[in-house]
Design a protein with these regions (language model features):
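N-terminal carbohydrate-binding accessory modules
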Residues: 217-221, 287-359
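N-terminal pre-domain segments of enzymes
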Residues: 20-55
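Bacterial Sec-dependent N-terminal signal peptides
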Residues: 1-21
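Aromatic-lined substrate-binding rim segments of carbohydrate-active enzymes
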Residues: 355-407
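Beta-strand-rich binding/interaction modules
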Residues: 136, 227-260, 266, 286-288
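Accessory beta-strand-rich segments of carbohydrate-active enzymes
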Residues: 63-67, 96-97, 101-213, 238, ...
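Conserved, mostly hydrophobic/aromatic
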Residues: 62, 138, 204, 284, ...
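Short hydrophobic beta-strand segments in globular cytosolic domains
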Residues: 141-142, 255, 328
């Protein structure tokens, strides 16, 4: 009987947690809105270009509060918000405006798995619009400015030995009242201008790493000589002695390997590589590892492709865009990346992929991403599906307040 009661209580708790969230307002919903699970929001690893096996997703229900700018952390919060959907969106469960005179506060707790003991813990944000201050256990550990770029913070020194830790994020976003890049966001949307996107709008996650660990991977293909040049960046206390190894795999088989000091350019030669093109979006897997004193301390998965994009004048002097040394007429839609229910954030990864697949099915080979930078998984799907991307810089204020006002 006791086991039955415990099982019922556990079930009731789960149901209650799920029942707390629901889309707010009466905005149009996509078909994927009903597939959003508050206990498992966007569960896919968010950084396909540098993927670690061990990680913890912090998406889900957080507490939120909207307060006048400059006030201290609230002692009580307004309710729950479903991260990573912006507070103005329906899928956040809130659908409230913040404005340039207020700040948006987030709060949640998290635990660090016992298996991560002895590791450094990185707290990663896919994107927060616009200025974010991050607190762990009531200590301001870092800030980031920029609504479209990811950032990571090493939170290890601020974990206090307790099993549960407090995470607070404070966000200020003036939208069109500021000078920052913001794309189509305005306080009073109309016509071609859309709703502001304030706060966390991409996945938040934790991952354990060694004190020396991989931080970046840059791969540049040369199809004319069959060489992939790879530069691996690392956080290291002994950069000269830390060695990276890169393996290039074709359908699971290693076809090239190179080793070197982190930060140096490694060249991997492949005979007759298969070239990437829209009709055959061929990708090579990469395994990248970092070793210290001969011991492997970090390993990530990545991918790349052999392709060349160039421009050349034809016999009539007209500049032609080329792919893999052949003329390619690129044609595709202007894609603004807005969702009626999630604003900047797609309801699910399936939804994110759908638009790309449908665009390809309509006969296009290119998407112009208009004044928005998408999550990394969007570009990954384009690579896999054979879609070229023209990337816009998100537009900002015409006043250029960051630039000098006098010129010689």
């Amino acid at each position: 009987m006791r086991k039955l009661l415990l099982a019922f209580c556990a079930f009731a708790t789960i149901c209650s947690a799920g029942a707390q969230w629901k889309p707010a307002g009466d905005k149009i919903k996509t078909d994927w809105a009903e597939k959003v699970d508050p206990r498992n929001v966007l569960p896919e690893y968010p950084r396909p270009g540098m993927e670690r096996a061990d990680w913890q997703n912090l998406n889900g229900e957080w507490e939120y509060a909207i307060l006048p700018k400059g006030q201290a952390e609230p002692t009580s919060f307004d309710g729950n918000i479903l991260v990573p959907f912006a507070v103005e969106s329906s899928l956040s469960g809130v659908q409230k405006e913040v404005g340039e005179k207020n700040e948006l506060w987030y709060k949640r707790t998290f635990t660090v798995p016992s298996s991560w003991k002895g590791k450094d813990i990185l707290l990663n944000f896919g994107a927060v619009d616009w200025k974010a201050d991050v607190f762990v256990n009531d200590i301001l550990i870092g800030s980031h400015t920029g609504g479209f770029t990811p950032f990571s913070l090493n939170i290890t020194p601020y974990l206090n030995g307790k099993s549960t830790h407090k995470l607070v994020v404070r966000v200020w976003d003036p939208s069109d009242k500021g000078y920052q890049p913001r794309g189509k966001q305005v306080a009073n949307p109309e016509g071609i201008w859309y709703t502001p996107v304030t706060g966390i709008w991409q996945t938040v996650w934790l991952e354990p790493v060694a004190s020396s660990h991989i931080t970046s991977i840059k791969a540049i293909p040369n199809i004319d000589n069959g060489v992939m040049s790879v530069t691996v960046g690392a956080c290291s206390d002994s950069p000269v002695s830390d060695i990276v190894e890169v393996s290039l795999l074709d359908k699971g088989q290693v076809v090239a390997t190179a080793k070197g000091v982190q930060g140096t350019e490694l060249r991997l030669a492949v005979q007759n590589p298969t070239l990437w093109e829209p009709s055959n979006p061929y990708l090579y897997d990469m395994k990248v590892s970092l070793s210290k004193n001969g011991k492997k301390v970090d390993e990530v998965k990545s991918y790349t492709a052999f392709r060349k994009i160039s421009a050349e004048r034809d016999a009539n002097g007209i500049m032609r865009m080329r792919l893999n040394n052949k003329n390619l007429f690129q044609y595709g839609p202007l894609d603004q990346g807005w969702w009626p229910d999630g604003l900047y954030t797609a309801p699910t990864d399936e939804a994110l992929l759908y638009d790309i697949v449908k665009t390809k099915a309509w006969g296009f080979n290119m998407i112009r991403k208009h004044v928005k930078v998408e999550p990394a998984r969007w570009y990954y799907h384009c690579d896999k599906e054979g879609m070229l991307v023209w990337q816009d810089m998100p537009s900002g204020d015409m006043g250029n307040q960051w630039a000098p006002h006098t010129y010689n």
